Amino acid sequence: MVTVRALLLALAVSLFTAQPESSRPSFAEFLAGVRAEALSRGIREAVLDEALADIGEPSAVVIERDRTQAEAVLPLEKYVDQRLMPRQIAAGREMLARHHDLLEEIGAAYGVPPALIVGILGLESNFGRFSGVRPTIAALATLAWDPRRSALFRRELFAALEILNRGDIEFPKLRGSWAGAMGQVQFIPSSYLKFAVDYDGDGRRDIWATPADVFASIANYMQGHGWAADATWGREVKISGNAKRRIANEVERRDGTCQARRDMTTGLPVERWRALGVRTLNGQRLPPATPNAALVSGRSRSFLVYQNYDALLEYNCAHSYAIAAGLLADRIGARQAPRGEPTQQIPKAPQPPQAPRTRGQQAAEKPSLK
């Protein structure tokens, strides 16, 4: 009997093979072109022999997953509820307590709240428990050949080959998600090359198994995308039907490179949101706030979000993801925080120094005892 999954896989195959064959090379020809370009970029032949040898056909499963991402398919409210289950909040609090000193140190160095670091890790890999088993090179090769986002994934394929060429990880261990996201932090290869941190100073940026490198890499990514240490991400709010109509008529939508950025309003002063009828969840006036706030609305829940929300969208440009990350951090970092209260209840990390030092750098600066 034909299963639903088999039908989905057949549909996925048809989606990326429907275009005329004359418009693109066969998969084998594509891989040959990748090999030639990689050699011209300085990737060692031995690396390519190992990385490309066993890739026979493009993966229909990978294409299927690319068409049905949870953040894009599930309504915001359902996605958030699934990722804020009590067991996930408890697991986050346990990790926060177990690595308290290390997380406080990294939070202070990068200006990112420890609870946010842990919350992102919870969404990305269930607090490090699962980071994917799919061979990264094969997944990226499929997506680079598929025309939907070919240019993006072609860049990521060469970045992954560069990681192997540098010896950061052995090829058999280079596994991750269907989209080529790697390690507990689920960095795509280009993000790894730019933001991964060797915090423990052992010579490897190990986002797969070393807690210090994992936490610092997340913090470095958030800092690098504009997370401000002295600010919050946002808060849940209450909006009446009349207020929603006024907002739709009077407030402009934002421009942006991804759909999520276009599905939110421009930033307005809190006083303006008050005048439009936006209230706290318990119906009170919004408290004073210095930064402008934008409005993000799902089917039944709405949020005022600040500048730091943009940093969350940089990790994954979907409102369901960014809202879930912020709320999960709130729950992990503040046991008694009621639903919708902002991350002001989470102790702020101090302003980061100009150039955070890894533990290896710190050790090198200590006077020798010999």
What residue spans do the PLM features occupy?
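Sec-dependent signal peptide recognition
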Residues: 2-10
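Acidic helix-start/capping segments at beta-turn-to-alpha-helix junctions
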Residues: 48-73, 121-125, 135-138, 236-245
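Acidic/His-rich structured neighborhood in mature extracellular/periplasmic domains
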Residues: 77-219, 223, 233
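Solvent-exposed loop/turn segments at secondary-structure junctions
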Residues: 55-58, 124-128, 181, 299-301, ...
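An acidic, Gly/Ser/Thr/Pro-rich helix-cap/linker signature
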Residues: 21-107
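C-terminal soluble interaction/assembly domains
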Residues: 240-370
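Flexible, glycine-rich surface segments
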Residues: 171, 175-297
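Hydrophobic h-region of N-terminal signal peptides that target proteins for export
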Residues: 9-20
